[in-house]
């Protein structure tokens, strides 16, 4: 026999599942967008150490985001972590091989690696 108590319990269970599957993902998407935007804004403003922390935080939540990895790789290159930059670009390429940006960014990082390792400065300067 169906009682009003059973109906209330059924509605409650349906309500809980709807919240889990419809409301939670939209919150998650907003959090994702907010984290990405914050990291990108810090990068654009030249606050690279803070940007690196934010990209790390973002990638803790979304480790398979190729764009996030590529952007973190760019920040790593700017602060002098050339090998870390190349690693991030390689991961981004493996996740999304049709995206061109990580290939370009990896090439820039590899060029920087070669340029910096073979760079010799003159010991005397002529005026």
Task: Identify what each model region corresponds to.
Residues 117-123:
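Conserved small/polar residues in nucleotide/adenosyl-binding loops
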Residues 57-60, 91-94:
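Conserved structural position within tetratricopeptide repeats
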Residues 32, 66-67, 100-101:
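Helix-start (N-cap) detector for alpha-helical repeat units in TPR-like alpha-solenoids
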Residues 44, 78, 112-113:
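Register position in tetratricopeptide repeats
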């Amino acid at each position: 026999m169906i009682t009003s108590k059973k109906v209330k319990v059924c509605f409650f269970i349906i309500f809980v599942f709807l919240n889990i599957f419809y409301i939670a993902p939209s919150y998650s998407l907003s959090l994702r967008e907010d984290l990405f935007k914050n990291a990108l804004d810090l990068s654009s403003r030249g606050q690279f150490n803070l940007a690196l922390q934010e990209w790390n935080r973002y990638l803790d939540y979304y480790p398979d985001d190729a764009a996030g990895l590529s952007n973190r790789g760019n920040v790593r290159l700017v602060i002098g972590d050339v090998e870390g930059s190349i690693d991030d670009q390689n991961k981004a390429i493996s996740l999304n091989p049709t995206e061109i940006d990580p290939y370009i960014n990896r090439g820039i990082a590899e060029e920087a690696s070669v340029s910096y390792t073979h760079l010799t400065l003159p010991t005397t300067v002529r005026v």
